[in-house]
Amino acid sequence: MINVNEFRPGITFEFENEIYVVISAQHSKQGRGQANVKTKVKNLRTGAITIKTFSGGERVEKAHIEKISMSFLYNDGASIVLMDDSTYEQVAIENTKITWELNFLTEGIKVKLRKFNNEILDIELPAKIELKITSTFDAVRGNTTTNPTKRATLETGYEIDVPLFIKEGESVIVSTEDGKYVSRG
């Protein structure tokens, strides 16, 4: 059992027969009332992100998630195929479980497969990933008032805002948590 006051990003727990991972947790106490813990959590079975509020001191069951290092092989349209780096065993995961992660998957990338009691839940990407820019337009001279950016399409098809000095064909580092530009690759 784990106390909700100990919630930190990355902690996994079972609640109402579902498995969740904490994205963010905020503790609040109002006047004489009891403290609450407002959490943003991701359901690892459905991929849905919700906000749950727990009473301070409430306890939930800790979920012991097995993480296996895998390499991304390919996407066949309905599911992705991963290969275990040590046993060369291949595993397929439905695209519906990993819609956000699909924006950052390139051939050969290392990911962690999350399993709970032999049930495949989803994948965990590295915090930052290097991707190539396939298309962007040239900067317009004079368009530099405050922190100017332009739209760019990555090799996976995902679109992000990048600084004006980034050109087509360059590599950039992108955060997989919020999908934003971090730095040049």
Swiss-Prot record:
Pathway: Protein biosynthesis; polypeptide chain elongation. CDD domains: S1_EF-P_repeat_1 (cd04470), S1_EF-P_repeat_2 (cd05794). Its main location: cytoplasm. GO terms for molecular function: translation elongation factor activity. Keywords: Cytoplasm, Elongation factor, Protein biosynthesis. InterPro entries: Elong-fact-P_C (IPR015365), NA-bd_OB-fold (IPR012340), Rib_uL2_dom2 (IPR014722), Transl_elong_fac_P/YeiP (IPR020599), Transl_elong_KOW-like (IPR013185), Transl_elong_P/YeiP_cen (IPR001059), Transl_elong_P/YeiP_CS (IPR013852), Transl_elongation_fac_P (IPR011768). It is found in: Cytoplasm. One of its GO terms (biological process) is peptide biosynthetic process. The keyword Cytoplasm applies. The keyword Iron-sulfur does not apply. One of its GO terms (cellular component) is cytoplasm. It comes from the Bacteria. Involved in peptide bond synthesis. Stimulates efficient translation and peptide-bond synthesis on native or reconstituted 70S ribosomes in vitro. Probably functions indirectly by altering the affinity of the ribosome for aminoacyl-tRNA, thus increasing their reactivity as acceptors for peptidyl transferase. Belongs to the elongation factor P family. This is Elongation factor P. It comes from Mesomycoplasma hyopneumoniae (strain J / ATCC 25934 / NCTC 10110). The lineage of its organism: Bacteria, Bacillati, Mycoplasmatota, Mycoplasmoidales, Metamycoplasmataceae.
